[in-house]
């Protein structure tokens, strides 16, 4: 009898432990499942179709006109997100952009499936960008259109590119988002678009912005459309290279004048110097205030150096000519002129190549 009770007790304890284990496993599974659902952010697909883009280099801005669209799936009863909140996407580098810009610009909305949204609109406006003129006029620039939803962090919402649309449209991978109008007049506007890019990222804000309900460090998803441009070479050859070559050619003529023609040599060098200064001021007038030396400035500096050396050599050769009774001075003048004729273009060409590296 005692043995039967012992077996019954052991069986009851085993069932009890089994029940506790099963309950713990079930609870853990539910927690993991809930956590997985909670950690899965809403995916907001985005695309643009650029109709026009025009940079203003002096103001460090550009103007863009484009169609935009968003595609997303959302059951607000489960996510707690409304369509209006999801569309609170901002242009991070936009100028004078109103709040709820995308909601106000909607021109078409449809629902291809339950809780699925397709929304499109049109935007035209100005954007900031940071040009780099170090290699001007042979510089390359990057103009970005940056989207960010400041309402939900990256754990709740991420913005991704609608790459499927670009593939279906059979767009050139190097020119995604560009309209045929832009591509058709690509080389006729003083600059040339040589590629585009789309990148997804997140930005960390190390502030709660005074809201105690927020974490001190929050990450928000971003989508960046980039347009890369350079300048058409031929217009700048006629605008920059040819005038500077003419100025330096006038200075180079000094080395073919007789040593006693100091007045002609002085006139050529001084005129060339003043022309170079005025020319540099004219070119820099097309650029904003910048705090670094650009490529074209370096070419002008080497031009000033060559002009100054030419002026100094003219005076030296004139003084040697005054001592014409000394045959050694005539030979020295001849050698100096010969070396100057060789090194003058050599120094300038070397500087052009060296500064470009």
Segments predicted by a language model, with ranges:
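N-terminal secretory signal peptides that target proteins for export/translocation
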Residues: 1-14
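Low-complexity, intrinsically disordered segments with a bias for serine/threonine
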Residues: 8, 16-18, 33
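Intrinsically disordered, low-complexity peripheral segments of secretory-pathway and membrane proteins
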Residues: 34-76, 83, 292-357
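N-terminal signal peptide c-region/cleavage motif recognized by signal peptidases
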Residues: 29-31
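Soluble non-transmembrane domains of integral membrane proteins
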Residues: 35-228
